[in-house]
Amino acid sequence: MLPASSKMPHKQPPPPRKQSISMGRGARKRDEDSGTEVGEGTDEWVQSKATVKPPDQLDLTDAELKEEFTRILTANNPHAPQNIVRYSFKEGTYKLIGFVDQLAVHFTQVGNLIPKDSDEGRRQHYRDELAASSQESAKVVISETEILEEEEEPKEVEAGSQTDVPIVEASEKMAEEELMTPKQPKERKLTNKFNFSERASQTFNNPLRDRECQMEPPPRTNFSATANQWEIYDAYMEELEKQEKTKEKEKTKTPVAKKMGKMAMRKMTSMESQSDDITKVTQAAKIVERMVNQNTYDDVAQDFKYYEDAADEYRDQEGTLLPLWKFQNDKAKRLAVTALCWNPKYNDLFAVGHGSYDFMKQSRGMLLLYSMKNPSFPEYIFSSESGIMCLDMHVDHPYLVVVGHYDGNVAIYNLKKPHSQPSFRSSAKSGKHTDPVWQVRWQKDDMDHNLNFFSVSSDGRIVSWTLVKSELVHTDVIKLKVEGSTTEGLEGLQIHTVGCGTAFDFHREIDYLFLVGTEEGKIYKCSKSYSSQFLDTYDAHNMAVDAVSWNPYHTKVFMSCSSDWTVKIWDHTIKTPMFIYDLNSAVGDVAWAPYSSTVFAAVTTNGKTHVFDLSINKYEAICNQPVVAKKKNKLTHVQFNPIHPIIIVGDDRGHVTCLKLSPNLRKMPKEKKGQEVQKGPAVEIAKLDKLLNLVREVKTKT
C-alpha cells in the first residue's frame, strides 16, 4: 500500500507575471483632467477617467481658485439667543441674562459598551469565563472517550462471546454519559445591595471638626521706647494729674461726690477707665448673651408663648399659675423686693427696687431692670447708699425712673445716660422727706411742660416735685393731720398729730382726686386743690394700709389691703366696703388685672399668691398657690403685665418669680347664639356694676 501522501499530485509553481515590477523606471504621466498619477504598466481600472460635472456647476477662473479664505473656529454658537430676560422676584424687574449656554449637539449615539470596573462588567466577564471553561472540559471528555473506544474494540473481537456484548455496551454508555456531562463549577453568589437586615451595633462617635472663618486681621503698630528712672517718674506724674482732674469733674457734677471717700473715688475712676475699653464690644456681647439665654431657656419660652393648662376644661371655678422664669442677682442678695413696675413701652422690661423693711437692718439699695429675653442678668444696675422703697416709670418718657429712698430722698434715674448716678436728687435744702418714702407716682406735666411726680412718706406729707431747670422743686400738697388729736403746747400753741402715709393712688379720669392710706388704718380721699382738709375719710383697716389701687375700668371702685389679713373693695361714694376677703395672713400687695374689671391678685406673707375673679366666685379666690417656701420667704409685691397673661411676684430674699395665668384665670365673655361678643370698657363696667348692685340692694334692705 502506498502512503496516502504519495497519492497527492505535486503542485507546479506559477509562471512569472510579465509585468513591470519597478515602477520607478517607467515615466510617470500626470493627467491634467483628474490629477492622478498613472504608470506605464497599470491596469485599466487604475487609469484616469473623465470627471462628470453637472451642467449648472459654477466655473471659476484660476485667480479665483487660487484665492485663499481664512476660517476661524470659535466656541460660540451662532444659533444661541442673545437677548434672554428673566423676571427677578427679589428686585421686581426683568433682568437680562448675560451668560447663555453655547453647547450645540451635532451627533449622538447610544453605545453598548460596559465599563470593566462596573458591577455589570464583572458579571459578564465571570459568565464568559464559565462558558470557556465548560467548552474546554467538554473537549477533554470527547478525546478521552475516543481513546477508550479504540482500546476496547480488539478486546471485544477476541472474546467472541456475544452474551456479554449488551452488558459491556450498557456500561460504556453509562461511562460516556458521565464523561460527556462536565462538572459545572459552583457559581459565585453575588451580593444584593438592596437586600439587607438590621443588626444592632455600637454607635460611632462623630469626629470633631474645626471650622474656620476668614476675618480681617487686627491692626498692628510698631512701638519702641526706652524705660529709665525719670521716664517712669514722669508717667506716674501724668497719671496722678489725670486722676486729680477726674476728681474735680466729679465734684462739680454731683454734690454727692463730696461725701465719698478717697477709696470710693479710686474705684470709680478705675471702673470708668475699664469701661472705656470695653464699650466697643458691649453691644455684641449683649446680643450673644441673649442668644445663649434663648437656647438655654427655650422650653420656658415655649411654655410662656404656647402652653395652656388642659386641666382647666374639667374645673370651672379653679385655676393655676405656671412658674416660668426666676430673676435674681448676687449683688441684691438678701435685699427684699420693695417695688415692682413694668415699663409702659417695652412689655418685656420691668424694674425692681431692693431695700429692707426692717428698720434695725438698713443697708444699701439697688435698682435693677430685667428683661424676659435675658433672665440670667439684669439689663441695668444702679446702686444707692440708702434702700429703695418705691419706684415708678414715666408713661411718655419710659427711660426715666423715679425712686424713693428709706432716708427720705427722691431721685430720678435716666437709662439713656451711661453713668450709674441719678440725674436728679433731692436734698435737705430742696425739702426732702424726714421719714421713708413709701410710694412715688408720675403725674401729668405742669402748665410749663415741666416733669412732675408725687411722693408720700411717713412724715405725713404729700409732696409734689417739679423738675425745673435741672433742679427738683418741691410743693407740699397736703399734710395728713389726725382729727381730734390736737394738743396744746407752750404759750397756747396747738400741736397737731400727723398721720403716717404708706400708700396712695391717683384717679385715672378725675385728675385732682387721689387716695392716701396710713399706718393708722385709715384711707383719706384727697384733692390736689385743697391742702387743709380731706374730701372723705374711710375707717378701712385695723392695721397699716399696705396698698391702695383704683379699678382700671370702673371710676367709683377702688381696693385696699392691710396687714390685718384683709382685702377690701370699696365704692368711694359709700363709706362701707362692698366686699371683704380674709386671707389668713398679712397682705403685702394687691393689683387689678388689666384685661378684666373683676380680676385681681394679692400676695401674703405666708408665701401664697391669691387670684380672685368676682364674676366667677365673689366669695373665695379661684386660685391659691404657694410660690415660695412658707418658713423662709415672704411675698412682698405683685404686678400684672399690661399685655401678656403673666404676673411677677417679689419676695423678701430678692427673688422675682414670673408666673403664667391659666385659661380659667382670664376668662372672656362667652359667645351666645345669634349674638356677637361685646368687648370694651363699657362691658367691663357693666359686669362690675351688676355685682355691686347686688351688694347695694342687700345693704339698703338691712
Curated annotation (Swiss-Prot):
Cell compartment(s), UniProt: Cytoplasm, Cytoskeleton, Cilium axoneme
Modified residues (Phosphoserine): 134, 137
UniProt WD repeat ranges: 383-423, 432-475, 540-580, 582-622, 630-669
Keywords: Cell projection, Cytoplasm, Cytoskeleton, Dynein, Microtubule, Motor protein, Phosphoprotein, Repeat, WD repeat
Pfam family, one: WD40
Molecular function terms from GO: dynein heavy chain binding; dynein light chain binding
GO cellular component, one term: microtubule
Single biological process term from Gene Ontology: cilium movement
Region span, Disordered: 1-58
Gene3D superfamilies per the UniProt record, alphabetical: YVTN repeat-like/Quinoprotein amine dehydrogenase (2.130.10.10)
Assembly mode: Consists of at least two heavy chains and a number of intermediate and light chains. Interacts with BICD2. Interacts with CFAP45 and CFAP52. Interacts with CFAP53.
Role of this protein: Part of the dynein complex of respiratory cilia.
Family: Belongs to the dynein intermediate chain family.
Protein name, entry field: Dynein axonemal intermediate chain 1
Organism: Bos taurus (Bovine)
